[in-house]
Design a protein with these regions (language model features):
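Alpha-helical transmembrane segments of multi-pass membrane proteins predominantly involved
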Residues: 1-154
Length: 154
């Protein structure tokens, strides 16, 4: 992958993750989840065939639409300690991922760019799923965890 495209893609992914967990609106969170699935499509299209990557994109966007249909009336209330915890988790996981993911390339046969993004999404999803009390946030966290696993698996 071209380095500039990787930097742009990781910036969009980090901003999407931050927007998902710091927004009070479910629709805003779901829009950024759709953007996250679009970034995943661009990553998977480089490794998988275009048809499989498109199926993954359509499946993700349909998941976003279905969740929007059922959870559009849910209102999220963010409190200051939770916002600080989310920001600290994103920063902590980002630092750990950028520090240790390149060493994982000796064990996993994958480029370091895919491994960095996959491990970042996997760890963020796992931490958020473990610390969220809201079922909507837990569901979104599990979808992010599965996205990270798919990128690592690809």
């Amino acid at each position: 992958m071209i380095e500039i495209a990787f930097v742009i893609l990781i910036a969009v992914i980090v901003l999407s993750i931050a927007s998902i967990f710091l927004s009070e609106s479910t629709r805003t969170a779901l829009i950024f989840l759709g953007i996250l699935y679009l970034c995943e499509f661009f990553l998977l299209a480089q490794v998988w065939s275009l048809g499989l990557a498109a199926v993954n994109l359509i499946t993700g966007l349909l998941t976003v639409v279905i969740i929007n249909a059922f959870c559009s009336s849910v209102h999220l209330k963010l409190v200051a300690p939770r916002i600080a915890l989310d920001i600290l988790m994103i920063v902590f996981v980002g630092i750990i991922t950028f520090a240790f993911a390149p060493q994982l390339t000796t064990y996993l046969i994958e480029s370091s760019q895919f491994l960095i993004i996959g491990v970042f999404l996997f760890a963020i999803g796992l931490l958020q799923a473990g610390t969220s009390r809201n079922t909507f946030r837990g569901l979104i966290s599990l979808l992010i965890l599965f996205s990270g696993f798919q990128i690592i698996y690809a």
